[in-house]
Regions:
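Alpha-helical scaffold segments that mediate packing/assembly in large oligomeric complexes
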Residues: 95-168, 288-299
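Extended, solvent-exposed, turn-rich assembly/linker loops in the middle of proteins
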Residues: 134-208
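Glycine-rich, flexible loop segments associated with nucleotide phosphate handling
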Residues: 98-109, 170-178, 234-239
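Active-site-surrounding "flap" and adjacent substrate/cofactor-binding loops of secreted or lumenal enzymes
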Residues: 49-51, 57-71
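Short acidic, glycine/tyrosine-flanked loop/strand segments centered on an H-E-D-like triad
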Residues: 69-99
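Sequence/fold signature of self-assembling virion shell proteins
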Residues: 2-28, 35-38, 43-52, 72-76, ...
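N-terminal, well-ordered alpha-helical segments
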Residues: 40-42, 81-83, 107, 111, ...
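Helix N-cap / beta->alpha transition motif
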Residues: 84-89, 175, 181-186, 241-243, ...
Length: 299
């Protein structure tokens, strides 16, 4: 009975807190899928767009259906996990005064697995930088060397690329929904820019990774931004896009968690796995840049 509670609560925690733990995944519309096997293709329904048209008077035409796009995502990746609860921890959960306290205790012991799984999915999203429809480098394939003087220019450049749109009323820029996901080195230079707006004190809920605003972008920092190291130098590929509309992901809702007790061990262990897949259906909603950074102090 206790094992059922622990397994059930762990999977509930996963579904409830997984999205909150994503950073790069904030660019994505991710859906939980049940009963999937590795290699399956699933449909992910992306948020819809609204059709606009010229109006010169008279009766309005019949309304068009809001266009939703469905994209195929292959569930081709998996992540296994295992954790152990000491017998005293199980007793603490078992003897909790009510169901709510039991759930909170299980959450406390299982959140690290949720965080690690979300980080793994974020890394998969980071690899999609190669699909970006808006891209800039330093010329001839070289990286842009970040500095106090050009970091805002890069954000403004990407803003202009997104605002251009398709000249049919469809802009790739939506005020208040634009996210730039950068490595910590990028944030170092942002801190030197005068009009960079840090996170407001007293903010009701700070999203994981959110550090401030500049040039219309909500800026989020992630260690999972793609980095490629060669000859002692690391090149990074920050991502730019529209919150929840740029990337697509499918994640198994079943974690296949099983309790077991090894021989000569009094503690109970739990093992399981989750499956996932990612895609970039809207290249025009995704931007990236090739950058490198050398941080120095007092120069």
């Amino acid at each position: 009975m206790l094992d059922q509670l622990i397994v059930g609560t762990f999977e509930q925690c996963f579904k409830k807190y997984f999205y909150d733990e994503l950073v790069i995944g904030k660019l994505a519309h991710s859906e939980f899928k049940s009963g999937v096997q590795k290699g399956d293709e699933v449909d992910v329904i992306m948020p819809g767009t609204v059709a606009m048209f010229d109006y010169d008077g008279g009766d309005l035409p019949d309304a068009e259906v809001v266009t939703n796009s469905s994209t195929k995502v292959r569930i081709d990746k998996g992540r296994g996990f295992h954790f152990e609860l000491k017998e005293i921890e199980r007793k603490t959960i078992e003897n909790a005064k009510d169901a709510g306290q039991k759930v909170n205790l299980v959450k406390e012991y299982s959140m690290d697995a949720v965080k690690q799984f979300a980080s793994t999915v974020d890394q998969a999203y980071a690899d999609l930088y190669t699909r970006a429809g808006h891209y800039v480098d330093g010329g001839e394939g070289k990286a842009i060397t970040l500095s106090e003087s050009n970091v805002k220019d890069l954000l403004a450049y990407m803003q202009a690329k997104f605002k251009r749109g398709d000249n049919k009323g469809h802009t790739n820029w939506i005020d208040g929904q634009m996210i730039a996901i950068v490595p910590p080195e990028f944030q170092f230079f942002l801190g030197k820019v005068e009009d960079y707006a840090y996170v407001e004190s007293g903010h009701k809920k700070i999203e994981k990774g959110f550090v401030g605003k500049l040039a219309g972008w909500d800026i989020m920092v992630s260690n999972n931004v793609k980095g490629v190291t060669a000859e002692g130098k690391t090149t990074y590929y920050p991502l730019f896009g529209i919150k929840g509309k740029t990337l697509a992901g499918g994640v198994s809702s079943d974690l296949n968690t099983t309790p077991y007790k090894p021989e000569k061990n009094f503690n109970t262990r739990y093992k399981g796995y989750g499956l996932y897949g990612v895609g970039a259906p809207r290249a025009d909603f995704l931007g990236s840049a090739k950058v490198e950074a050398t941080m120095t102090i007092g120069q």
